[in-house]
Amino acid sequence: GVLDILKGAAKDLAGHVATKVINKI
């Protein structure tokens, strides 16, 4: 459903941001 798609997108975005932050340290 749409909620699943949004959840997946949120997870991908969170993972992307986390990776960026980790790489900055």
Swiss-Prot record:
Alphabetized UniProt keyword annotations: Amidation, Amphibian defense peptide, Antibiotic, Antimicrobial, Cytolysis, Hemolysis, Secreted
Alphabetical GO biological process terms: defense response to bacterium; symbiont-mediated hemolysis of host erythrocyte
Tissue note: Expressed by the skin dorsal glands.
GO CC terms, sorted: extracellular region
Cell location: Secreted
One Pfam family hit: Antimicrobial15
Predominant cellular place of this UniProt entry's protein: secreted
UniProt keyword Secreted, yes or no: yes
Modification Isoleucine amide occurs at: I25
Subunit composition and interactions: Monomer.
Main function: Has hemolytic and antibacterial activity.
Protein name: Syphaxin
Species this chain originates from: Leptodactylus syphax (Burgundy thin-toed frog)
Taxonomic lineage from the root: Eukaryota, Metazoa, Chordata, Craniata, Vertebrata
